[in-house]
A protein has these predicted regions:
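N-terminal Skp1-binding subsegment of the F-box domain
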Residues: 1-30
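Residue-level detector of intrinsically disordered/flexible regions characterized by low predicted structural confidence
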Residues: 1-11, 36, 43, 79, ...
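A generic structural micro-environment signature
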Residues: 7-9, 30, 99, 118, ...
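LRR N-terminal entry segment and analogous cap-like coil->beta motifs
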Residues: 19-21, 30-84, 97-101
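Concave beta-strand-loop units of leucine-rich repeat
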Residues: 44-49, 62-69, 82-89, 101-108, ...
């Protein structure tokens, strides 16, 4: 599939008509595009085994729907990535990434890039891996099941912890917003 150079957005949604749906049923796909956002939430995507988004174009934001759980190659210039509920694959994140949101089933070892400033785990996240937070992280949100020891970044300004968090932590002096058990402190 080759997307025209003047494409601004690539959208494949469950509710699109069959004639408008992008045929993503082949085993391997490459997206060569000039769009800056990609949103994929189509049941046909589950047939893809590998998805490559070529980095020489200007894709800055990618959102995958809840059914997406395939291997992906991300562009080097990506800044925002949202992975849906069922995504649980090993993934290499680009050094340009600033915003990252994981869905509820993600539970893989991961190396976070130093460029990351916003990290969110879905409210129902079942993430149980050790994690090293980047030094530049300013916003961190964990879901209600997160309950593991963690060392917070000295640059952290916003922290949200769910009802299941019962660890002692040292809060950095930079912290200006703390939400714990959904109540602002």
């Amino acid at each position: 599939m080759i997307i025209p150079n003047d494409t601004i957005y690539l959208i494949s949604d469950y509710n699109c008509s069959v004639k408008d749906a992008i045929n993503l049923s082949l085993l391997n796909k490459e997206i060569y595009d000039n769009c800056n956002r990609i949103y994929l939430n189509n049941p046909l995507i589950t047939h893809i085994k590998n998805l490559h988004i070529i980095s020489k174009y200007n894709v800055k934001k990618i959102t995958f729907g809840d059914d997406f759980n395939q291997l992906i190659t991300l562009p080097n210039n990506l800044t925002h990535l949202t992975l849906g509920a069922r995504f649980d694959q090993l993934i290499t994140l680009p050094n340009s990434l600033t915003h990252l949101t994981f869905g509820e089933y993600f539970n893989q070892p991961i190396t976070l890039p130093n460029s990351l400033i916003h990290l969110t785990f879905n409210e129902e996240s079942q993430f149980y891996q050790p994690i090293d937070l980047p030094n530049n992280l300013t916003h961190l949100t964990f879901g209600c099941y997160f309950d593991h020891p963690i060392t917070l970044s000295n640059s952290l300004t916003h922290l949200t912890l769910g009802v299941g968090f019962h660890q002692s932590i040292t809060l950095p002096n930079s912290l200006t917003h703390l939400i714990f058990n959904k109540d602002s402190v």
